Amino acid sequence: MKIIQYFVVFALIFSSFTIVSIGQEAGKKEIIIDIDFSVPIISEDKSFVNLDVIGANTCLNEPGKPIIPMCTKNYVVSFGTIIESVKCEISEIKTMTLKNEIKPAQQPVKPDGKSDNREILTKGSIYQSEELFPYDWFSYSIGAGLDENNEHKMFLTLQIFPVRYNTSENKIYYIDNAKLKIVYKESDNNPFPTTSEYNLLILTPTKFSKQLEKLVEHKESFGISTNLVTLDEIYNGDYFPVEGRDDPEKIKYFIKNSIEEWGIKYVLLVGGRIPGIKEKWHFPVRYVHIWAWDESSYISDLYFADIYDSYGDFCSWDSNGNGVYGEWLENGSLVDDMDLYPDVYLGRLPCRVKFELNIMINKIIKYENSKLTKKIVLSGGDNFDDKPYGGNDEKEGELVCNKTMEYLPDFEKECVYTPQMDISARNIRRALGKGAIFMHLHGHGSPTRWTTHKLLNYDEWEDGLFILDLPLFFNKQYPIVVIGGCHTSMFNISMTNSPWGMPSFRGLSDWLIVKVGGGAIATLGYTCFPVATPGESGDLDGNGINEPDCVESGYGYMQLRFFYGYGEQDLDYLGECWNFAIANYTDHFKIPYERTHIHTIHGFVLLGDPSLMIGGYEE
C-alpha cells in the first residue's frame, strides 16, 4: 500500500483526548487513531449526487459548499496540555469521476422561513475553484472547558475527510484508511486549587447585596458554599488587582481569579436593565458583533463564562484589541478568536428593581425546599415548510418535543400539539396545571411572544404565548421553561428599544421568572436569531442515526442537548445542563466557523440560578 505522510509540528495547548498509548520518551503520551473507510457510495439527488462512506459518522455541511462525508473524534486531556506533533498517514489516493456535481449544503433558513429553491441550493464560489475541497485530509479544533466531573479540561475535536472533491474536474479523490498520531505532553502548571473554598459566586450591584444575604444563607444550608461580591468591590480591587479595559472585562478577569483562587464552579450575575429611556444596566452586559440576518449586535452572557482559550490563557473575545467583541461584520470574516466552551456554570437574574429580586429569591428558596412533580409540558407545531430543504412535511416542533420526551421516560407528559388542539396560552396553562419540572416550547419567537403554525398552514400563526397572557399563570410549582425561537430571551428590551417585536417593559422569558405566584423558576432561550435547520441533509450530529435535521442541528439540537444532559447524563444542577448543551453544540458545530452557529451558541442564555437543584432537594 502506498503511504503518503503529512506532518505538522507546533506547540499548542490542547483540549479533549483519549490516551491510546504512552510514548517511549518520559512524560510524553500519544493518541493513535486508525480508521478504515469504504469506497464512496454514490446516489442521485435530482441534478446532483450525494456521497456516503462507511466509516464516516457525519458530514461536512457548509452552506454553498459540497456536502462531504466526515469522521469526527472527540478527546479530553488535562488543562494545559501541549501538543508537540500531529502526523497523518493516508492510504493510496484513488479517483472517481462523477456524472453530476456533489449537492451543495443548503443555505440557512431565513427567520421567517420563506426561501425559494434557488436561494436554498445556491452554489458557492468553491464550485469554480480548481483546489480540492476540503483543503486537507484532516482538521481539528481545540478548546478549554469543564468536563462531566466539573473539572477544567481541554478538548480536541478531530475531523477526518475520506473524500476530497475537485469541482472543476467533477472528480473525487478518496482513501480507504487514515492513521493519525498525536504526541502531547501534559503540563505541570495547574492554576486551580485542589479544594474549593467556594462553590457559588454571586456578583451584584451594592444596592442588591442586602437582599441577597437570605439567598446566601439558603444556599449554604444545602452545602453550596457561597461568596457574595459587589461590583464596587471588584472595581476597587478589594479581593484581586483590577484588570480589564471596561467594566465587563474587569468582571470577567475577576471570575478568572475566583476560579483560580477559590475554586468557583457556579456564577450568578444579579441585575438587569435600569428602567428608563436610555439603556443603562445594574449589571453590565457584553454586546458581540456577529452579523446575520440584519442583526449586527446582540447580548451574550456566555462572554462571562468563556474564561480560557485553547492555550489556557484569558479569552478576551477581542483578539485585535479594537474594542469590538466577537467581530464578524457583514462583508468580512471572523476577526476575534473565541473558545466558546464555558469554564463556569453561569446564569443571570435580570431584575430591574428590588421588588423583582425579592420575588426571584423567594421562588428559588421555595423551589429548592420542595420536591416537584416529575412532569413536563411540551408544545410545538409545523415551524417551517421543509420540502425545499429535502424534508417530508415534518412538524419540527413536535419532532423536537417528542425527542425531549425520549430523554425523560419516567416523566408525566402533557402535550399541546396541533391539530389535536390550538396552541394557545389557555391550553398551555391547562396542561401545566399545578406545575411541572420542565416546559419545552419549540417554534418561532420574538422578545414578547412565542408561537408556531398548524401543519402546512404557514401563513397563519397560532395564538401561542404572549406576555399579556402571563398574569393568568397561577401554577404552584415553577417549571424550568425552555423557549425555542428567535429572541425569546432578549432581556434588554424596553418601550423605546424593541427592534424585533412590539414595545414592552420587558420580555417573555424574564417576565416569566418575575411572575408572582406562578410562572417559571428559570428560563432558557435566545438573545438573538438562532439558526433553524428544517429538512434533511444527512447525519449532522454524527450519532449514527440519520434523523430530520431539526433534531440534529440548530436551535432544536441545542435545546435537546440541555434535556439530554439532565435525562441521560444525570446532571442535577441547572447550570450543568446549560453548560452541557453549549459545550456539546460547540463540539459539533464550532468548526468550520459559521455565523449562524455562533449566533446560536452565543445567544443561548440561562436566566436563573445556575446552582439550582433541578426538581428541588426535599423528598
Residue ranges and their predicted role:
Residues M1-V8:
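Positively charged n-region of N-terminal signal peptides that target proteins for export
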Residues V8-S16:
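Bacterial N-terminal signal peptides
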Residues S15-G23:
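N-terminal signal peptide
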Residues G23-E619:
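Cysteine-dependent hydrolase recognition
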